[in-house]
Amino acid sequence: YFARTLDVPLEEAVARTKAALAEEGFGVLTEIDVAQTLKAKIGADFRPYRILGACNPTLAHEALKLEDKVGTMLPCNVVVQDAGGGRTEVAAIDPVASMQAIENPQLRTQAARVGAKLQAVMQRLVIA
């Protein structure tokens, strides 16, 4: 995975992450508030933790044409979580690592393109 720790509160990190994703062509299809969900479903307390389901439609379409089972790994999840002390960690899956389970060389090339975009998202967070 790729990760960055930011010296900002969670809500600001979520907003920055969504903006950086948009700049790289990703839309956020889902947003799961894990702490809220765990509290509602099982009464468990958990630190502030969000999962953003990000998708670049063009790259997803290309990947699906190469391998129809790749949909089991979509969208790309990006985690934004409280790291304590007013800091927030943002982490995204490395698609090259996750796609190793699928034996399709063309898909690995596509995963590298997605990975480069997610790394660019992380870099944008640092300079934001």
Where are these regions (language model features)?
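Terminal, regulation- and interaction-focused segments at domain boundaries
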Residues: 1-25, 123
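Beta-strand/loop substructures that line and gate deep hydrophobic ligand-binding cavities in soluble
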Residues: 77-104
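Conserved active-site and cofactor/substrate-binding residues in soluble primary-metabolism enzymes
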Residues: 8, 12, 33, 109, ...
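Short amphipathic alpha-helical/adjacent loop interface patches that line ligand
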Residues: 14, 56, 115-118
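Short glycine-/small-residue-rich flexible loop motifs, especially phosphate/cofactor-binding loops
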Residues: 18, 35-36, 119
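Compact, glycine-rich, soluble single-domain proteins
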Residues: 27-79
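Well-ordered alpha/beta subsegment
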Residues: 101-128
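Solvent-exposed residues in well-ordered beta-strands and their adjoining turns
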Residues: 7-9, 55, 81, 93
